[in-house]
């Protein structure tokens, strides 16, 4: 499929997207792969990772650790980097509107041996608003 302005960011093949990837054969001790719901790499200067959770579903420890380390590694490489935890209550069978999902937590990357930190407060902003502010988007 050719990508156009009209279909960028949209699922191109819904049937394929519903397929589940079995990572059970990729276990290393107690370490198993995790997925990343979304990432924006902005002009080699900023990176935004995002993870979507239904309502108040927790982030498994292993996934949290992996995402924090990715954010910190990007920061060490000189990129301003954050991870947004987004919440939604989208009914099963409907597409989740990423831009309108509520950001409830933000992890800000720390470079080198300095770890990052979590901002957990009622931001009252959706993912689009947080990304616009972080990236300085004036679109």
Predicted regions and their residues:
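Active-site-adjacent loop/helix micro-motif of nuclease/hydrolase catalytic cores
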Residues: 31, 56-66
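Helix-rich interaction surfaces within compact, conserved domain-sized segments
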Residues: 95-139
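Conserved catalytic cores of phosphodiester-cleaving nucleases, focusing on short active-site segments
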Residues: 38-40, 46-55
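Compact, well-ordered interaction domains used in eukaryotic information-processing assemblies
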Residues: 53-57, 69, 73
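Basic, amphipathic alpha-helical patches used to engage nucleic acids or provide basic targeting signals
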Residues: 64, 69-70, 77
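Nucleic-acid nuclease catalytic cores
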Residues: 74-103
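Short beta-strand or tight-loop elements
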Residues: 34-36
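Acidic-basic catalytic patches of nuclease active cores, encompassing PD-(D/E)XK
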Residues: 1-32, 125-139
């Amino acid at each position: 499929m050719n990508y156009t302005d009209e279909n960028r960011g949209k699922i191109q093949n819904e049937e394929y997207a519903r397929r589940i990837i079995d990572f059970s054969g990729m276990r290393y001790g107690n370490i198993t792969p995790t997925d990343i719901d979304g990432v924006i790499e902005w002009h080699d200067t900023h990176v935004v990772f995002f993870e979507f959770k239904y309502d108040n579903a927790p982030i498994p420890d292993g996934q949290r650790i992996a995402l924090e380390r990715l954010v910190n590694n990007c920061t060490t490489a000189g990129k301003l980097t954050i991870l947004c935890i987004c919440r939604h209550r989208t009914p099963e069978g409907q597409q989740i509107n990423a831009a309108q999902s509520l950001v409830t937590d933000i992890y800000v990357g720390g470079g080198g041996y300095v770890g990052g930190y979590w901002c957990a407060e009622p931001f009252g902003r959706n993912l689009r608003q947080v990304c616009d502010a972080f990236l300085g988007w004036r679109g």
